[in-house]
UniProtKB/Swiss-Prot annotation:
The gene is acyP. Its EC number is 3.6.1.7. SUPFAM superfamilies: Acylphosphatase/BLUF domain-like. Residues 6-93 form the Acylphosphatase-like domain. PROSITE patterns: ACYLPHOSPHATASE_1 (PS00150), ACYLPHOSPHATASE_2 (PS00151), ACYLPHOSPHATASE_3 (PS51160). It is an enzyme of class 3 (hydrolase). This is Acylphosphatase. The active site is at R21, N39. Keywords: Hydrolase. It catalyses: an acyl phosphate + H2O = a carboxylate + phosphate + H(+). Belongs to the acylphosphatase family. One of its GO terms (molecular function) is acylphosphatase activity. Disulfide bonds: none annotated.
Amino acid sequence: MAELARAHILVSGEVQGVSFRAAAVDEARRLGVRGWVRNVADGRVEAEAEGERAKVEALVRWCGRGPPAARVADVQVSWGAYGGDLGPFSVRH
């Protein structure tokens, strides 16, 4: 059985106004990862993701690149225990 994990992700750089959230939703759903993504008032993008650890790690790697218009400066990840309480990946406001 695959290892399950949860990650809290903070992405900084030019990551707002470049369709980062919509692209993150597409990538997470493609990977089968559950959770959410939202803009933060300080200019970062925040996400909470859970699922098979390898798939969550793939989403974290994607966040390091982002969509074509993004210029990612840094990605901070805090790993936690899988909770099983997140819904289909979506944008939070």
